[in-house]
Amino acid sequence: MYQAANDRYEKMAYVRCGKSGLKLPAISLGLWHNFGDTGVYENMKEILFTAFDNGIVHFDLANNYGPAYGSAEKNFGKILKEELGVYRDELLISTKAGFDMWEGPYGNWGSRKYLLSSLDQSLKRMGLDYVDIFYHHRMDPETPLEETMGALASAVQSGKALYVGLSNYDGPTLEKAEAILRDLKCPFVINQNRYSIFDRTIEKNGLKDTAKKLEKGIIAFSPLAQGHLTDRYLKGIPEDSRIMTDGRFLKKSALTEEKLVKIRELNGLAAGRGQTLAEMALSWILKDGIVTSVLVGASKPEQVLDNIKAIQNTEFTEEELRKIDELSLV
């Protein structure tokens, strides 16, 4: 039976989420790719245990994480039931709904019917009475924002979520949503968005500035740009890489020779800081205190340990920041 490390809280920094009472670990663990039915169950357990032993208390899921849809929640729920659940009050568990989950008009987007039905299903798969954070997973251009935000508020009012969050929103829509949730007295605390040295969308669409103004947290996903910001591709594209074996999310065409040159230069900059490229990429996201936590994935426990090293050096010189911008901004 798993027993958590006694010194787990000495290994991680915890950051207040906006102006709320909730704190997140600087590094959080996402269960997007490696906790579905194609994963090895014992490896999933070791990844989660390694994370928790090192102070990572936040585990992020969504209804359709897998593959297959729902399988990441199901496997996570099994691990909770068998071993990790004794620490439930020390864990921050989130899930989401907003992308396609089941057939028909009620299995996608942002209707009240979809969101609340999906949350009930997620709780059942994980064997939980509530989640700590329930997110709407993406903006819905057709459903009234009042309906979607009302569904999030209902999740809290029914005791099925403690806090709510928004994922993949832009600045203007965030501002409108926040006003609705504030009127509903709903504890909206966090935004989840893609952010990395190579992807500055939240700087361009107003999300980062608006979240700061509204005193809401941000948790950044894909901080390593689907592996581009690691040593994985420094010598080209390996045959066993995700680009070659699974092109759904990462296309070979995205890794041009020009991009590889930039990656190698960034790697040299990281080495000068005494970091790996991945460590520097994570540190860069945390550099200004606006992003609360960085969401990392892991296919093996060792990757969790490597990612945690990023919190040891989040200070950058002006010259380092200038060079990073020069190599990454289009």
Residue ranges of predicted features:
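Beta/alpha (TIM)-barrel catalytic core signal, keyed to glycine-rich beta->alpha loops juxtaposed to Asp/Glu
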Residues: 2-11, 143-330
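N-terminal binding-site loop/beta-alpha segment at the start of enzyme catalytic domains
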Residues: 1-91, 157
